[in-house]
Amino acid sequence: MREHNVSVWSEFGKKINSARSKIRLPKGSEDSPKRFALRANDKKQEKTPRQKYVYQEPEASVLLNQRAVWDRIKGGEKPEDALGASASVLKVHHVPLISVIVTTYEPVIRYFEQTLISILSQTYGGYELIIADTSLSSGVRDTLDHYRDERIRYYSVPGNRGEASLINDAAHLAAGNYLCTVDVGDLLTKDALYEVFLCIMRTGAEILYTDEDHCDAAGKRFDRPNRKPDFNKDYLLSNNYMQRLLVIRRELFLALRLRDSFDGALTYDLVLRAPKSAVRHVPMILYHRSSASEESKMAGREPDAEAAAEKAALEDYFRVRSIRAVVSYTGRKGIYRIKYSPNIFACRSDVGILGGRVLSRTHKVVGGMFDPQGRVMYEGWDEAEGGPMSRALTVQNAFAVDARCMKVRPDLQKLYEEIVEKPESEPYVDWQKDPQELRRRSILFCSRVRELGYLIVWDPSFITVV
């Protein structure tokens, strides 16, 4: 049974008392720091009905313009001239070649062909397609004979090779500056590599990832859009969220390589080991994950193999860094919980604040995590509601968190007292009736902490009830 605490401001200038009655801490967590609670106005919010998702391909004029940009670059123009107005923000001035790697073993040819067509239909032509085929039959090779394109490089690979070994060898053979993989059956949107090219030119990214959705085996119906956050370290430590499309600089890939021992979580292990300073998110759906590819990947694999591999990758991440942490399953697919010993501040010097959720007595979210506009994330949601990808129930980094449910790094306690606690010289404010002032001070304190270079971690299992 989880422990309960409540702290209440009784009058201006007094420090938060430590009476325990209504704060629920994560199981095994350390004692709560000073905090205060105010009575929330528990109004039931009406939710906007969820609209059916429809993937919208870019307009024809947009795709034509992208092709025109590539044609001009191919014709010898400098990228900054071909791109026109957006060239002023370019950090890279050489055109990247992207190596797209597809591994095959006796694939269903119609699925392979769908994937092939989606790659050959790219508006950005600066790529090569590497097919590493371990099939005994000639189906893949015969299909490629109908698509004679100088950018296709076919390799027949003898023997029964693991996916990690195949991709590592293909990466050595690749001529590109960047690499990505596409599973048979999955589809790239027509503008996928163009948007990757733009991101590379503008940011010089080492690793890029995009949003994705799911499609049926025919590639006609789309659902379950996965709109991902920008790089979020603690969300990555809780969930293999980058997934597809993942693009990485070839030199970095060759330095890290995929490891056979993490089959089922190869790219997750790779990203966890990679430097994070040059990771960039392309916030567009550029990859369609097919039900056909998912069925193919699960064939011959234990049902829990992927989760076990992801958990092992996380455990290896902490072991290498000598961080005492226990990784456990949460019961939600692909979501993990990390328990630090003795606590997160002792284990990680990059964390300044640990925040949680503020719930009403009717188990509705009334506070906890704030977005940059100062709005409460998931406000009005039920306590057990996770939303898409269980994001509302997953540990992640936050812009700001609520002072009513907050733990502070010991060496930041003085700053906390200066900003959050009321100095004696100010007029009395009834915090029970002034949630805006509480929100303002919470966000100001968190902003100062982030300016000092610390992360703010939001843990939805750390709860205050008001």
Model-assigned labels for residue ranges:
Residues D133-R141, G159, S349:
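A conserved acidic beta->alpha catalytic loop
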Residues L116-G126:
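Short, acidic, metal-binding catalytic loop of nucleotide-sugar glycosyltransferases
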Residues V157-A174:
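Glycine-rich, basic loop-to-helix element that forms the pyrophosphate-binding segment
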Residues Q45-S118, Y329-I344:
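N-proximal low-complexity "stem/linker" segments adjacent to membrane-targeting elements
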Residues A164, F222-V247, G374-L412:
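A recurrent flexible, glycine/aromatic-enriched loop bordering the glycosyltransferase active site
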Residues L252, S261-I285, L314, N397-K407, ...:
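A short, conserved alpha-helix in the catalytic core of glycosyltransferases
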Residues L187, D191-F222, F345-R375:
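Conserved donor NDP-sugar-binding/catalytic core segment of glycosyltransferases
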Residues L179:
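Short aromatic/hydrophobic "clamp" motif used to bind/position activated sugar donors
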